[in-house]
Amino acid sequence: MKDKVYKCGYKQCKLGGKVNKDIAVKKGNRYYHSECLQEIYNKEQIRELFLKHINPTEIISLLNRTINQIIDVKKVSSEFLLYALEYVIKNKLPLNRAAGLYYIINNKHIKNDYMKQKAKEIDNKIRNKNVQSNNEVKFNLFIQDNTWNRIIER
């Protein structure tokens, strides 16, 4: 029996546009790849952060066009753009317009900080896997008598 195949609901799907039922994520009446749905959430969060912290009077269509241009045409990951915007807000760097997003994605300090953060996340994942794989508990019991000889040996 064939698996049911749905069309991914994300217009800019980078994974071929078709998603199998076993890996599909449903939101509303549409089915998405998990990566596509994460990108949609990231874009929404970028939009909200920009309008809340940077410029609430920015034209929405211009902001959307800029975000789509950066993510879809320039092939910058939505995670990096979200991180860069959070970095600008946290460090109070100057950013007034949506066109300024082009400049923050090329900032060397932001790129280096992002790479360090990603390296830490990967390191933590590796450590967690190693901890989970070593579930065997080794317990050794050494019975020692409490005598003056033991105190003198130390």
Q: Language-model segments: which ranges?
A:
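Short, well-structured alpha-helical interface segments that form or flank functional binding sites
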Residues: 3, 65, 99
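Canonical RING-type zinc finger of E3 ubiquitin-protein ligases
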Residues: 17-26
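Long, charged low-complexity interaction segments
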Residues: 25-76, 133-154
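Short, cationic/aromatic linear interface patches
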Residues: 79-135
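Intrinsically disordered, low-complexity coil segments
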Residues: 15-18, 58
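Short cysteine-rich clusters marking metal-coordination/redox-active sites
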Residues: 5-13, 33-36
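Short metal-coordination and nucleic-acid-contact micro-motifs, chiefly zinc-binding Cys/His arrays
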Residues: 1-9, 26-29
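Residue-level marker of positions within ordered structural domains that often coincide
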Residues: 13, 38-41, 106-109
